[in-house]
């Protein structure tokens, strides 16, 4: 899944701002109808809710993640990814700026 760039895509100019600007992303639309978001999360402890299943690919930085229903925290860094079921949530703790790609199923 790791690629250095996405070709032949459209990018929505308006940024997605969440949690008072602690998470900022842009939506990327692919010719086949799929979408991804490219973004950063600044240092914070946040809870995200999902509609569709997501795969979070970490490009830079590290984070701790706890999926809904779990008591265990997992640490992820550059080159790693984690999956979140649809209609669920996850907690994320970021100590340094996290650069990510969110792949929607």
Curated annotation (Swiss-Prot):
Signal peptide stretch: none
Species annotation: Cupriavidus necator (strain ATCC 17699 / DSM 428 / KCTC 22496 / NCIMB 10442 / H16 / Stanier 337)
Gene name in the database record: ppnP
SUPFAM superfamilies: RmlC-like cupins (SSF51182)
A family per Pfam: Ppnp
The protein, known as: Pyrimidine/purine nucleoside phosphorylase
Any single GO CC term annotated in Swiss-Prot or TrEMBL for this entry: cytosol
UniProt entry tagged with the keyword Transferase: yes
Keywords: Glycosyltransferase, Transferase
Gene Ontology molecular function, alphabetical: guanosine phosphorylase activity; purine-nucleoside phosphorylase activity; thymidine phosphorylase activity; uridine phosphorylase activity
Family indicated by similarity: Belongs to the nucleoside phosphorylase PpnP family.
Keyword Transferase appears in the UniProt entry: yes
Superkingdom, natural source: Bacteria
């Amino acid at each position: 899944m790791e690629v250095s760039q996405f070709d032949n895509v459209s990018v929505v100019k308006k940024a997605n701002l969440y949690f008072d600007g602690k998470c900022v992303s842009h939506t990327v639309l692919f010719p086949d109808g799929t979408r991804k978001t490219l973004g950063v999360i600044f240092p914070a402890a946040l809870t995200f809710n999902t509609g569709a299943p997501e795969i979070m690919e970490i490009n830079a930085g590290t984070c701790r993640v706890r999926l809904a229903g779990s008591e265990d925290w997992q640490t992820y860094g550059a080159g790693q990814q984690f999956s979140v079921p649809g209609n669920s949530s996850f907690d994320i703790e970021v100590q340094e700026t996290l650069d990510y790609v969110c792949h929607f199923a």
